Amino acid sequence: MSAFSEAALEKKLSELSNSQQSVQTLSLWLIHHRKHSRPIVTVWERELRKAKPNRKLTFLYLANDVIQNSKRKGPEFTKDFAPVIVEAFKHVSSETDESCKKHLGRVLSIWEERSVYENDVLEQLKQALYGDKKPRKRTYEQIKVDENENCSSLGSPSEPPQTLDLVRALQDLENAASGDAAVHQRIASLPVEVQEVSLLDKITDKESGERLSKMVEDACMLLADYNGRLAAEIDDRKQLTRMLADFLRCQKEALAEKEHKLEEYKRKLARVSLVRKELRSRIQSLPDLSRLPNVTGSHMHLPFAGDIYSED
């Protein structure tokens, strides 16, 4: 990966698009350079405020991706984003429309669900986003309809995916978390003591308690890491599903167009074949001049009219 500099980050942020691939690519670059987390967050906040309103939400998507996916590597980004994230939410919320606030609300819901930040930060984010109004609780049916609408809007880009992009997406899933046999074995081998609260009664001394605490901590880290990888894989598979749907739609449109062209050229072929057949028929009925006597340069004279009509 390229070396980190504030100028390089500014350039990458200026080129950031709303596509999942663009966000994830820059997110990976930032996580790779996580030792520069403080200047990264500073540049991110500065460029966020300079960005056009229709690009501000993408900056929050980037922060979300970095914060969630860097947790496995270390707490740097979660900690360094904390002092600025509330004001960032407030800024984006005030500069954009209700649709954007709806997307911000989804990000906030995920952070609540996954306990990305402490409750006091989450409450400040809610205040920044909703003000004194509490977010309205939605029914299960409303949530499903909302998800379907969101999936449809993301699944109908103006341009279908390139074949190479589709192949790469499929190849990436060959090494997906669900196929990691080694981790499966480690999870399957977790001792029952770390999974059953009822067995805590068997702890009789501090040493055994600390030993079990270490085992539980390791199990939590293993499962949290694997759950994060599975969540990322689910997102990748959803994206691949959309890509395949777009690719299939494009291929169906191309198929219909080519079938129409084929019928058109079949009709042209039929017309040309008919002309050829008729031409051959007419050629057969014409006299063959090559079979006439060659009179050029011969001493043979054509008869005179008087010779033809002379009386005997």
UniProtKB/Swiss-Prot annotation:
InterPro entries per record: CID_dom (IPR006569), ENTH_VHS (IPR008942), RPRD1A/B_C (IPR032337), RPRD1A_CID (IPR047884)
Highest taxon listed in the record's lineage: Eukaryota
Ranges of residues in domain CID: 2-133
Coiled-coil stretches noted in the UniProt entry, renumbered to this chain: 244-286
Gene3D superfamilies associated with the record: 1.25.40.90, 6.10.250.2560
Disulfide pattern: none
Keywords for this protein: Acetylation, Coiled coil, Nucleus, Phosphoprotein
Pfam families: CID, CREPT
Residue(s) carrying Phosphoserine: S153, S156, S285
Induction (free text): Up-regulated in cells overexpressing CDKN2B.
GO biological process: mRNA 3'-end processing; RNA polymerase II promoter clearance
Cellular component terms (Gene Ontology): nucleoplasm; nucleus; transcription preinitiation complex
Location of N-acetylserine modifications: S2
UniProt subcellular location: Nucleus
GO molecular function: identical protein binding; RNA polymerase II C-terminal domain binding; RNA polymerase II complex binding
Record-stated family: Belongs to the UPF0400 (RTT103) family.
Annotated function: Interacts with phosphorylated C-terminal heptapeptide repeat domain (CTD) of the largest RNA polymerase II subunit POLR2A, and participates in dephosphorylation of the CTD by RPAP2. May act as a negative regulator of cyclin-D1 (CCND1) and cyclin-E (CCNE1) in the cell cycle.
Subunit structure: May form a heterodimer with RPRD1B. Associates with the RNA polymerase II subunit POLR2A (via CTD phosphorylated at 'Ser-2' and 'Ser-7' of the heptad repeats).
Protein name: Regulation of nuclear pre-mRNA domain-containing protein 1A
Organism from which the protein derives: Homo sapiens (Human)
